[in-house]
Amino acid sequence: MGVLRHVVCAMSGGVDSSVSALLLKRMGYHVTGVFMKNWDSQEEKGLCSSDRDCEDAYKVCKMLDIPFHEVSYVKEYWHEVFSNLLWEYERGRTPNPDIICNKHIKFKHFYQYAVNTLGADAMATGHYARTSQEDEEVFQQKLTEAPKSLFRDRFEIRKPVRLYQGADLLKDQTFFLSQISQDALRHTLFPLAGLTKGYVKKIAAEAGFQHVLKKKESMGICFIGKRDFENFILEYLEPRPGNFVSIEDGQIMGKHKGWFTLTLGQRARIGGRADAWFVVDKDVTTADVFVCPSTFHPALFRDTLQTDRFHWIAEEPPAELVHTQMMDCHFCFNNRMPLTPCTVTLNLDGSVWVMVKEPMRGMATGQFAVLYKGHECLGSGKIIRLGPTKFALQKDQSNTNCLHKDTNQQHPEPHS
């Protein structure tokens, strides 16, 4: 009789993690369900439903007759995710807490808890994603430390595990997994890898998981709940009012409560104005937020960005990029957007420049640039610098044309 493999499944109280636990048990594994509490909602007037989610996860584990545990990462989440979120917003950036949470909480602290405390052979989550490993290969992996240099040891014989989009491309969640470590990925199972959301719901219905099936799919950030983002963020950051300024003529259009309540591309709520204006830039030194009068204004579009040191899931850049310093692939900075063709340039410090084929709307610093080659998610880097907008380039071209015109007028062609 073979060894009974122990898999710890992260339980959120939702349909995806519930079906993941069910499938793992059907595969013959010894499954333990664990609910993570990452946010203390005692002072949030019940807006974050973590208590109900925990109860729902417990009910599923009871129905499956598997052990259930609850673990708190409230302190870790505050210091490693939420504090970082506030720091980024104060500097005018637009962070992604879901990517940061997966990196630091689910695939670091929870992963270590599963392996070291519960003695798991592997962990599992309900993400719609897959890897290059067969399930049995996951159990053969050894724990190793992440490389401390830009490239891993060339003399280390270690085939990297690769992250791929799941079968349901509409629900693919590799975007949110683009910062996780190679070591955690090696020890993770994704039971929903080959399934569609519709089929997962069918499995849940047949299993009698009605209490999770009827729940609305979580969208957005849990700790904000149903509140307006501006009201939420102002509970943690002091209001810093400033002006809405037209990008076209410098006219003051109205007042705002703080640049950190706004992100590039969103509609600016300017009192007394019925027409739509959109955020195109922020100056944290003057508190000015620059706006434009159309959702398709050229000031919202740009085609170039730079990241910080890029996190390659396979621990090193693709050979093509190392050899030529340039590579064609696909890019996105928002999980709801389609993948866009781009060219990537590798810098000596490990950062990358990304140039997309067509200018894109609403890119902002603090967001993550996620790269794909085919269906493989290569990794991501935080956007630290943006190239010029179409509007800025048009102005430069206009000024250059005016300069040439003035020069020609000052030095007219001699008459023949």
Curated annotation (Swiss-Prot):
Site feature Interaction with tRNA, where: 127, 267, 367
Catalysed reactions, semicolon-separated: 5-taurinomethyluridine(34) in tRNA + S-sulfanyl-L-cysteinyl-[protein] + AH2 + ATP = 5-taurinomethyl-2-thiouridine(34) in tRNA + L-cysteinyl-[protein] + A + AMP + diphosphate + H(+)
The entry's keywords: ATP-binding, Disulfide bond, Mitochondrion, Nucleotide-binding, RNA-binding, Transferase, tRNA processing, tRNA-binding
Cellular compartment(s): Mitochondrion
Enzyme Commission code: 2.8.1.14
GO cellular component: mitochondrion
Chain intervals for the UniProt region annotation (Interaction with target base in tRNA): 96-98
Domain of life: Eukaryota
Region: Disordered, residue numbers: 397-416
Segments of this protein annotated with the region Interaction with tRNA: 171-173, 334-335
Keyword Lipid metabolism: no
Disulphide bridges: 101-222
Chief place of localization: mitochondrion
Active-site positions on this chain: 101 (nucleophile), 222 (cysteine persulfide intermediate)
GO term, biological process aspect, one: tRNA wobble position uridine thiolation
List of residues binding ATP: 10-17, 36, 126
Single GO MF descriptor: tRNA binding
HAMAP family linked to this entry: tRNA_thiouridyl_MnmA
PANTHER family xref list: MITOCHONDRIAL TRNA-SPECIFIC 2-THIOURIDYLASE 1, TRNA 5-METHYLAMINOMETHYL-2-THIOURIDYLATE -METHYLTRANSFERASE
Function, as annotated: Catalyzes the 2-thiolation of uridine at the wobble position (U34) of mitochondrial tRNA(Lys), tRNA(Glu) and tRNA(Gln). Required for the formation of 5-taurinomethyl-2-thiouridine (tm5s2U) of mitochondrial tRNA(Lys), tRNA(Glu), and tRNA(Gln) at the wobble position. ATP is required to activate the C2 atom of the wobble base.
Family under the similarity heading: Belongs to the MnmA/TRMU family.
NCBIfam families: PRK00143.1, trmU
Miscellaneous: During the reaction, ATP is used to activate the C2 atom of U34 by adenylation. After this, the persulfide sulfur on the catalytic cysteine is transferred to the C2 atom of the wobble base (U34) of mitochondrial tRNA(Lys), tRNA(Glu) and tRNA(Gln). The reaction probably involves hydrogen sulfide that is generated from the persulfide intermediate and that acts as a nucleophile towards the activated C2 atom on U34. Subsequently, a transient disulfide bond is formed between the two active site cysteine residues.
Protein name: Mitochondrial tRNA-specific 2-thiouridylase 1
Gene name for this UniProt entry: trmu
